[in-house]
Amino acid sequence: MACTTILVGKKASYDGSTMIARNDDSGSGHFTAKKFVVVQPEEHPAVYKSIISHVEVPLPGNALRMTAMPNAVEGKGIWAASGVNAANVGMTATETITSNPRVLGADPLVVYQPARDGQPEVPGGIGEEDIVYLVLPYIHSAREGVLRLGKLLEEYGTYEMNGIAFQDVDEIWWLETIGGHHWMARRVPDDSYVVMPNQLGIDAFDLDDAFGAQENYLCSADLREFIRDNYLDLSLDGRLNPRDAFGSHDDADHVYNTPRAWFMLRHLNPNTWVWDGPAADYGPRSDDLPWCMVPERKLTPEDVKYVLSSHYQGTPFDPYASYGDKSMKGAYRSIGINRNDFMALIQMRPDVPEDIRAVEWIAYASNAFNTMVPFYANVERTPAYLACTTGEVSTDSFYWVSRMIAAMADASYARSLIHVERYEEGVLSASRALLNQYDKNIASAEESQRAALREEANTAIAAELKKRASDTLDKVLFELSSGMKNAYARSDA
């Protein structure tokens, strides 16, 4: 998927939480309806079979309950995408990344080959369709998630290049696939954040740690030999830069990928470097943008949502710019794009009881015109407003309401923007108030009451969301209708 990811270490966040967030985007010309659901342990089969690659993977028999963001329309696989399991481990997958011919020639992707000329089919490897479903129900820490996925990659291979984030209350790990069977993972520094467009991102890797103490780096068992035997290390000083060894620096990266990383870093560290002009330290086409940075202040969920909604505001590249030099307007791929399917931000809070530790902030459709809303993840079911998505357009579905608001507000941008801004602030304020109240109620409640209170809280938040979303839909529909080309100023007498 064409996505954007941001990861925030616990000492870089406002309350000590670890936060992982990703926009899940459809490919150009497509929109994928999504839903927010709970997957129970008994729903997992003994053997998983991929729709795309036909690979069959036996599953352990000790699955945990998990939340997920699967496709709402069946037929093309599960695509669980993002979720939290009952052990308070979060995962988001995947960020499609890039590679280069040297890597792909040395370790080709494992692509499904259909039966032909009397020969049986050859299954492919695992991919984005499968990864969350194969890993999240069976792990109890972020590090354990890296190791399980790494083992699956080495055994079954993959047919695509992907980046995957794992999180618990203490750690965040980022794994990137390398060719068909290799991989590397790096622990996000606690005091830093990471931004990831659709490009291999890790820019430094300590092989000695990965093959020694494994404190901050992990990798496939033969990665050192793979690098040596295929002359992949391009450094002059012996310090491996994985971005040079395994990644890409194509012209397409400079309009599709690097500008997104540049804008996020520029927004969160505006004074650390010079970001604009001919003397800039980093520009939108720079290949050496840092993988991680220490922010200039602690980051909030709202900061994460802003950068994942961005479209180069305040730069010459904003597609909605109505002033200044417009020659570069829309030159680069926005983060908040028309084909955002959903955004999920998983927050692991250290200062509350474990049963309310995990909060999932969910948004649907184009982030430039939506709002995110928080829900407790430790539940048996999710609110129908977020779970009832089908292929049929309906105002009873938050996904479809968000799609309609986005399309109408885009077409009436100048008049509708104020309604979208008030909608987002109103939902965030009201849902935070409800979350704060229920945090207190649940913390002081008897154990037998807590599960019901978590679901009651989610229901109350969804009801408030639905009311405000319906009101905003009404407002942007009015603005767009008022600007129709067949409008006429004179009314009947």
Residue map of PLM features:
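A contiguous strand-loop segment
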Residues: 2-128, 148-280
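Short Pro/Gly-enriched beta-strand edge/turn motifs at strand-loop
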Residues: 60-65, 146, 322-330
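Short, well-ordered beta-strand elements within core beta-sheets of diverse protein domains
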Residues: 132-138
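Short, charged, surface-exposed loops that flank catalytic or proteolytic processing sites
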Residues: 138-144
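Glycine-rich, aromatic-lined ligand/substrate-binding cores of catalytic
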Residues: 225-351
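Substrate-recognition/cap regions that form aromatic- and gly/pro-loop-enriched pockets
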Residues: 313, 317-444
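Histidine-centered catalytic/metal-binding microenvironments
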Residues: 424-493
